[in-house]
Amino acid sequence: MIWVAVVITMLLFILVAKPTGIYLEKAFQGSKKLDKVFGPFEKLIFKITGVKEYNQTWKQYALSLVLLNGFMIVVVYFIFRLQGVLPLNPAHIEGMEPTLAFNTAISFMADTNLQHYSGENGLSYLSQLIGITFLMFAAPATTLALVMAFIRGLAGKELGNFFIDFTRALTRVFLPIAFMAALVFVALGVPQTLDGAVTAQTIDGAKQSILRGPVASFVAIKELGNNGGGFFGANSTHPFENPGQMSNILQMMLMMLLPTALPFTYGRMVGNKKQGRILFVSLFMVFLLGFITITTSELNGNPALNAMGIEHVQGSTEGKEVRFGTVFSSLYATVTTAAETGAVNTMHDTLTPIGGLVPLVNMMLNTVYGGVGAGFVNIIMYAIIAVFISGLMVGRTPEFLGKKIEGKEMKLIAVTILFHPLLILGFSALALSTSLGTDAISHSGFHGLTQVVYEYTSSAANNGSGFEGLGDNTPFWNITTGLVMFLGRYFSLITMLAVAASLKEKTVVPETVGTFRTDNGLFGGIFIGTIVIVGALTFFPMLVLGPIAEFLTLK
């Protein structure tokens, strides 16, 4: 029965992808019906804020994005610092420590949601609503706006205006869908209140304080926007965030909704629907392989316990919620790292070595399917690399969407693809070379190395999940992961927008018999191979020293 539920869940991922992709294309490219519904409200916003409707250059678009995001980071930083004297603080929570406020503000603006604090004890309701929830809308709206400009550039059209795209992302996508999802979560038992903690009497007569809050609205945008941060420290293992299997499936659907839709949006916007389908199918195959790997490893149980003759019919149950079970915990772990959300319904630090390898690889690749917007930019980056390699093999100038891929584009892509592992491995080396980093490690040996690398991988990929055995709420970890999150977020977005702008200016080369097609199974295979060879092999030495070595040791 559990496998039937898994198949149905995956079919739901597939069934909603195309309709959502079509809706996104209409939402951003203009639809009379949508303009009639949302247009008056959007025009009012533009009038109040003074936004002028004109097309920006890629530099203007990128500058607008960075300045607006930077302003939001500063505002939310001071909300965190001053929350102790601000209203909506029934628990009388003190202001955040400076480096923790720095880390948290960047974390949520970068759509990472790395949490070095416990949600219910670290933030007031005002901070949760005005700080955290606000950024949970603004962060994915930023990248959804950018990916639309990116696709327009690839299609040879004007990039558009960041502020208009940003507003449409909020009004036409995130606000309506999150509102409906929040109502469903309330119906499924997720609380939504501004009242303080309630005192309950336990069976043995003791009194217990049960924390609550505006959780349903928080969880809706947490999953839809690929944010991942928890209202409670236990994240989606907490029964108030994720009461049962229905809420669990809904959360996974929300996580996958926009990332899986974007290939179809892309296909419609560039006039090559078949290429969009090929990208979707190729990535789903990689996703499926990851799920099979982690599930097989977790169902085989803990090798150390197996050697003692302990029954393991349910697999490795350490760190997992009984109401979800091993299979759905494995699926959730695959989804949350494939879609770069970072929400967890099981503790990733307790996964088996190969089980923990899958989330780590998903984040290192950062492209299966990746987070809202930013993930799809990485997908196209790998697609262009695949075309470039194929062109070199047959002695032709590589072409993508009829545009020649030349030195300028490949230099930008080369720098972008090297920057991600440089952040992860460079800062991991720094942490391992000083006691400021190693003092946080709770396990020695191979697992300890994996804890460190997982933290920086999660930060660079804007995922936010963690091997929570790491004692990371220290100035060193707050500052270094904050820097990694900021650089990992904005560097690749800007460089790839420059690539799209460069391709926009090029003339379309007529298709000939020798043109390498990017809308068939051959390209799909080369695309997957490129992801594995260029992406995975970059990190292979580290994976051997971490989870693979731990697996071999346990065996």
Curated annotation (Swiss-Prot):
Presence of the UniProt keyword Metal-binding in the record: no
Keywords attached to this entry: Cell membrane, Ion transport, Membrane, Potassium, Potassium transport, Transmembrane, Transmembrane helix, Transport
GO molecular function, one term: potassium ion binding
Presence of the UniProt keyword Transmembrane helix in the record: yes
Entries under Pfam families matching the protein: KdpA
TM annotation in the entry: 2-22, 60-80, 130-150, 173-193, 246-266, 278-298, 374-394, 412-432, 483-503, 525-545
Family of this protein: Belongs to the KdpA family.
Name of the molecule in the record: Potassium-transporting ATPase potassium-binding subunit
Provenance organism: Bacillus anthracis
